[in-house]
Amino acid sequence: MSNGLPISIGRPCTHDSQRSLSAPNSRIHSGFNSLLDTDLPMVHSEGTSTPTQLLRHPNIWFGNLPPPPRRPQDNRDFSPLHPLVFPGHHSQLRHVHETQQVQQTCPGKLKLSGAEELPPAPQRQHSLPLHITRPSRFPHHFHARRPDVLPSVPDHGPVLAETKPRTSVRQPRSATRGPSFRPILLPKVVHVHDDPPHSSLRPRGSRSRQLQPTVRRPLLAPNQFHSPRQPPPLSDDPGILGPRPLAPNSTRDPPPRPITPGPSNTHGLRPLSVLPRASPRRGLLPNPRRHRTSTGHIPPTTTSRPTGPPSRLQRPVHLYQSSPHTPNFRPSSIRKDALLQTGPRLGHLECLGQPANLRTSERSPPTKRRLPRSSEPNRLPKPLPEATLAPSYRHRRSYPFLPNPPAALPSIAYTSSRGKIHHSLPKGALPKEGAPPPPRRLPSPAPHPQLPLRDLGRTPGFPTPPKTPTRTPESRITASPTDIAPLDSDPVLSVRTEVHAPERRTFMDPEALRSALASLPSPPRSVGIIHTAPQTVLPANPPSPTRHLPPTSPPWILQSPVGEDAIVDSEDDSISSFYSHDFDSPSGPLRSQSPSRFRLYLRSPSTSSGIEPWSPASYDYGSAPDTD
């Protein structure tokens, strides 16, 4: 038929498509027609072949085939045991054919590989070409469920064959229809590599290895007439860092003596020992399995008693050349007492330079301050040079430089409970009575160079007075603390009260001031610097309240910022620094650089002139609180 392929024996059906069965002849049995009309669908919707459904029908059973299972299966699960053709002895299905064109298998595609022919001459023998693959064991296999897919054949790579021998059987010249005779080759070892070196998809397998027998070497007999030189054992090797120090009360092994060849004894035989040489120490057994290492660091065992006296825990100490038992100590930098040993590392001065073998009981107890105390008493700080002094307002003290003890004061001076020193002046050093003129301020020029107080007599404005003042019994007058001017918390308010007080006299004769300053005792140290700046006008004679005279001489203002940068000890009240000297001027209050002042008050023994007993001729210390 042109459009169909009659189903017969030996013709495989390789394509499944929708098919329908028809009975063109009336010779088909009517019972089979009833089966086809009622139970067998002619066109399957899922594309299942009709013969497959016919074979799986439970009511149709062919003689040689087993009955199919009754469970339903899809088109991809049919068993390969059922062929796609009907048996030939059933004549009723002989003329059943397909109505659609079926894709046939090309007979030229399945071409069997022919017999491999060898070259005619043995001189042209070579290895197998790479395009010839090893034939599979079953070349005609089809896939069980997909017949158009061939099974995968593992590729083992090229076969490396050795050179074939010259004695080979030739094939006949003409090809015959019979089976081809392969050449008979001698058995040779062919190394076949199952897995290629660059394949990552192949399972790894052990490569074939050839086992080579070990070469037996003859045993050499030891020479009886020559003793071999044995190398020194490793235990005697000091190593890079030298021999390890020994524990106390231990002795070092004697050094190995060089082997000296003795008299040749041809008859005596030296036995060869398999075990290593025994250790000279007691209580240590050699281990033949362990590699021989240095044993110099191993202390002696507990079985060996030390020769020295029994001691407690062995602690390392320093090594000294003068020590009589130098080999019994281990060189180390750790002292016997670990707590006292931390002193030099922390910078304690008392722990430096002491021997290491000093016992704890012999060591002096450490002080609290960890600083050495000198036997000399504390000295006053030396005055710094003038170039190093700078105006600093950080440390100001109102405590005076009082002599210690206070009994060292001169007879004309006395101290009060508030820290003031009062000096009694002679009777002639009193100012004249007069009314204070109104204040008059003038622009102050640049100050003169500062000079210390000890050079007071050398200044141009002050001639050098005699150093031995006259003292009268009447000048030695003591006053109670109640006569002292009260202290005010506000220095400005205190100055204002001093200005408006009518009983305070601020006029002073320069000659009387010079004599008063000359009668004062010299201070214990340089305490001041003199500023001679004409800020106000001081008349020569006390004028009337309505007259104004030109200035004749400037007032003497003593300002001495001494000891500003000196170190002040807070524990000693007798050592302090005061800032300046100040004298009241007739022009009113002068604002100084620091509220800490001491003033000069004059006291006259007679009060008949109507002047207040206290005049500005006494030192006033501590008139302001601390500014620290």
UniProtKB/Swiss-Prot annotation:
Residues 320-331 have a biased composition (Polar residues). GO terms for biological process: symbiont-mediated suppression of host innate immune response. Signal peptide: none annotated. Keywords: Host-virus interaction, Inhibition of host innate immune response by virus, Suppressor of RNA silencing, Viral immunoevasion. Residues 434-450 have a biased composition (Pro residues). Residues 497-507 have a biased composition (Basic and acidic residues). InterPro entries: 45/70kDa_tymovirus. The keyword Zinc does not apply. Residues 299-312 have a biased composition (Low complexity). The keyword Coiled coil does not apply. Residues 1-25, 141-332, 347-398, 418-507, 535-628 are annotated as: Disordered. Pfam families: Tymo_45kd_70kd. Acts as a suppressor of RNA-mediated gene silencing, also known as post-transcriptional gene silencing (PTGS), a mechanism of plant viral defense that limits the accumulation of viral RNAs. Belongs to the tymoviridae protein p69 family. This is 69 kDa protein. It comes from Turnip yellow mosaic virus (isolate TYMC).
